[in-house]
């Protein structure tokens, strides 16, 4: 289950009113590209939630970016510090067998990659009404499926 910690920069009443599921592509847009819209989406009001998978994906993407010369070692260290800070300020949902079973089933818009299916399964298994959940993503496959499942997308 999730470690339930309201984000440090969100008022308690806003945190209980809506959930913002942060998918790894949005987090990476903020970390690697300093994308202003992604940064704003990450800081928006609401209870922020993500899968434990997000942090492995992000760390691997940062390593890949350094190894391929996209970022320097110093930039990687700074991004990893920002990633760890973000991890302390968000509710993290464990990668459970229920999530993996759901991820292995069909989604409304196929094909979808396995890790994207894990993110969508995590959102579904939160058990919240879709109209109260916004999925923050930059991935078109995740967007299409989120909308088809009734979730808002940012």
Task: Kindly label every feature range from the protein language model.
Residues 1-57, 65-77:
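Short, well-structured N-terminal submotif of metal-dependent ribonuclease cores
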Residues 44-45, 86, 105, 149:
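Alpha-helical scaffold domains
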Residues 22, 152-154:
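Short hydrophobic/aromatic-enriched beta-strand-loop microsegments
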Residues 2-8, 89-141:
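Active-site neighborhoods of divalent-metal-dependent phosphate/nucleic-acid chemistry enzymes
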Residues 41-44, 85-87, 129-130:
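Short glycine-enriched loop/turn motifs at secondary-structure junctions
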């Amino acid at each position: 289950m999730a470690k339930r910690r309201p984000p440090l920069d969100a008022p308690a009443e806003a945190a209980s009113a809506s959930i913002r599921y942060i998918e790894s592509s949005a987090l990476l847009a903020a970390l690697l590209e300093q994308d202003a819209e992604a940064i704003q989406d990450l800081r928006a009001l609401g209870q922020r939630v993500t899968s434990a998978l997000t942090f492995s994906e992000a760390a691997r993407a940062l390593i890949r970016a350094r190894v391929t010369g996209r970022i320097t070692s110093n930039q990687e260290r700074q991004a990893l510090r920002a990633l760890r800070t973000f991890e302390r300020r968000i509710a993290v949902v464990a990668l459970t067998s229920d999530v993996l079973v759901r991820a292995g089933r069909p989604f409304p818009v196929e094909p979808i990659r396995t890790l994207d299916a894990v993110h969508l399964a995590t959102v579904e298994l939160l058990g919240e009404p879709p109209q109260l959940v916004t999925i923050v993503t930059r991935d078109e496959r995740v967007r299409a499926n989120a909308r088809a499942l009734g979730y808002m997308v940012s």
